[in-house]
Design a protein with these regions (language model features):
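A general alpha-helical scaffold signature found inside nucleotide-binding enzyme cores
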Residues: 44-47, 98-101, 144, 148
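PAS/LOV and related PAS-like sensory modules
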Residues: 44-63, 68-71
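Short coil/turn segments at secondary-structure boundaries
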Residues: 86-88, 138, 182, 209-210
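Periplasmic peptidoglycan-binding/anchoring modules of Gram-negative envelope and division proteins
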Residues: 87-125, 154, 196, 204, ...
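Periplasmic OmpA-like peptidoglycan-binding domain that tethers envelope proteins to the cell wall
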Residues: 127-200
Length: 210
């Protein structure tokens, strides 16, 4: 009788361990499959980011210079303002009409880029900067300058940037608050400029849906 009980115990124990082994095996396989899918998704995302970064190089070097250290474009058209001014009409230049034509051409360049890549959704950020001086409101001023450029493109130059683009206006001031914004140290006046960010919106949506 005792021998039968022991035999039944070991048989049940063996069945239990076998079941646990198969459960652990299934879980192990499931984890491997999930990790493989995650790796594939990450690789696809990296390829997408590289493709987008490459596509933004379509922007003309006549008007834009890409800075890989900050991953931003600098609008190469030199714009100089009197202290405290944000209107493009107040620019300090020897040929204001030529300067405005160049700015309009730069806006058209962005418009054409967005049109040529209309299968994607983008965030376009126009960032204004200011040089350090005695003016107390350079952060507000840099925003107003970026807003002035956007209005010039849309209202004065009749440039439409399409439905695949969300436009944001920002100002990073004169660097007094040490926000680690992109700054030039050799010539402070060089910080009176516009920075252009073109971000691929699809990438952010892909991350949210994962």
């Amino acid at each position: 009788m005792t021998q039968k009980k022991e035999s039944f115990f070991w048989t049940s124990y063996s069945d239990l361990m076998t079941s646990l082994f198969f459960v652990m095996l299934v879980l192990f396989i499931l984890v491997i499959v999930l990790l493989h899918k995650r790796m594939e998704a990450t690789e696809t995302q990296l390829l997408e980011i590289k493709r987008v970064e490459q596509s933004t190089k379509d922007l003309s070097r006549d008007y834009f210079q890409y800075r890989p250290d900050y991953k931003k474009y600098v609008l190469t058209i030199q714009v100089r303002y009197p202290a405290g001014k944000s209107d493009l009409k107040d620019m300090i230049t020897t040929d204001k009409d030529a300067q405005l034509r160049q700015l309009a051409a730069a806006g058209c360049e962005i418009r054409d880029f967005l049109k040529n890549h209309n299968e994607n959704q983008y965030i376009l950020i126009i960032e204004g900067q200011a040089s350090k001086d005695n003016f107390l409101y350079n952060y507000e001023l840099s925003y107003q300058r970026a807003l002035g450029l956007m209005r010039f493109w849309i209202e004065d130059s009749n440039i439409t940037f399409g439905n695949n683009c969300e436009i944001l206006i920002s100002g990073s001031g004169d660097g007094k608050l040490d926000t680690h914004s992109m700054r030039e140290t050799s010539n402070e006046k060089e910080n009176q400029r516009f920075l252009i960010h073109i971000l691929h919106k699809n990438i952010f949506e892909h991350n949210e849906n994962k």
